[in-house]
Amino acid sequence: MPVQGRENMDPKSPGYLALIAQRESLDAQIIAARKAEREVAIGQIKALMKEFDLSVLDLQERVQKRNSKRMSTVPKYRDPATGKTWSGRGRQPAWLGNDPAAFLIQPDLPAI
């Protein structure tokens, strides 16, 4: 029994199963190409590291220094009703109203 709706399709175009098989073949080719190019890239990186006397630690330090600049700020204000906080940067939340000092978070006082 012929499949309905197939009569309007181009008989020369590949069917669903053929396209799935092509995709699987392409996926395998992509994986193989990525693996080969990855090996080349690793070789180039190793050569540059040797040329400039770099270690993995040198690279890690650089990344850590860059990430340390993006530290989050400590909240200065807290809404007692919801527990939401605001650091004092950016747009002031509506819950602060006209008296932000009333919402200041008190630093922990040292024990006497």
Swiss-Prot record:
Q: Where in the cell is it found?
A: Cytoplasm, Nucleoid
Under Gene3D superfamilies, the record lists: 4.10.430.30
Q: Where is this region: Disordered?
A: 65-92
Note the DNA-binding span(s) on this chain. 89-94, 89-95
Q: Which domain of life is it from?
A: Bacteria
* Keyword entries, A-Z: Cytoplasm, DNA-binding, Plasmid, Transcription, Transcription regulation
Q: Which residues form the signal peptide?
A: none
Q: Which residues form a coiled coil?
A: none
Q: Does the keyword Transcription regulation apply?
A: yes
A molecular-function term among this protein's GO annotations: DNA binding
One GO cellular component this record assigns the protein to is: nucleoid
Pfam families in the cross-refs: Histone_HNS
Which SUPFAM superfamilies would you find in this protein's record? H-NS histone-like proteins
User: What does the protein in this record do?
Assistant: A DNA-binding protein implicated in transcriptional repression and chromosome organization and compaction. Binds in the minor groove of AT-rich DNA. Binds nucleation sites in AT-rich DNA and bridges them, forming higher-order nucleoprotein complexes and condensing the chromosome. As many horizontally transferred genes are AT-rich, it plays a central role in silencing foreign genes.
Q: Quaternary arrangement and interactors, per the entry?
A: Homodimer that oligomerizes on DNA into higher-order complexes that form bridges between disparate regions of DNA compacting it.
> What family classification does the UniProt entry report for this protein?
Belongs to the histone-like protein H-NS family.
Instruction: Tell me what else is known.
Output: Encoded on chromosome 3 and plasmid pBVIE02.
The protein's name is DNA-binding protein Bv3F
Originating organism: Burkholderia vietnamiensis (strain G4 / LMG 22486)
